[in-house]
């Protein structure tokens, strides 16, 4: 749950920064309406209960509604949608939610019934959501990866400045707690 929360905090912060770009022709106060955060998770029976609780707190998941079969046919996935204004805080590994005042974020949550791995999740994103949303750019982030406060904006800006770009990747840095881990030579290298 805290890895998921770490990622969502970074994504939410990026959306907030885009909403605060008042002089931008593309972004600004209503920027959140141009961004959809899609979350794809494998296997309903195996999703971390605390992560489910965070998703429920954000309003994009309801426990007990999903069924394995409908009319005798296996269900492939469950899709939930919600625009949340709930914020997330993280202290160490303790996740807490702030019920008011956060920048709105449009969320789509796809919970697959069976484990099909990451590439299948990417296919779900591009083939299912991509066709419906018709996005200008897509940013894929693994749970646990925390995007910098304006890194998604800068990634978008690269595509905006050069429309012939087909793909880009960002830099990943190790999160250190003020150098504490540097005492361990395996971590320091």
From Swiss-Prot:
It is found in: Cell membrane. GO terms for molecular function: chitin synthase activity. It holds the Pfam family Chitin_synth_1. Its main location: membrane. It catalyses: [(1->4)-N-acetyl-beta-D-glucosaminyl](n) + UDP-N-acetyl-alpha-D-glucosamine = [(1->4)-N-acetyl-beta-D-glucosaminyl](n+1) + UDP + H(+). Its EC number is 2.4.1.16. It is a multi-pass membrane protein. It is an enzyme of class 2 (transferase). One of its GO terms (cellular component) is cell septum. Belongs to the chitin synthase family. This is Chitin synthase 1. It comes from Xylohypha bantiana. The lineage of its organism: Eukaryota, Fungi, Dikarya, Ascomycota, Pezizomycotina. The gene is CHS1.
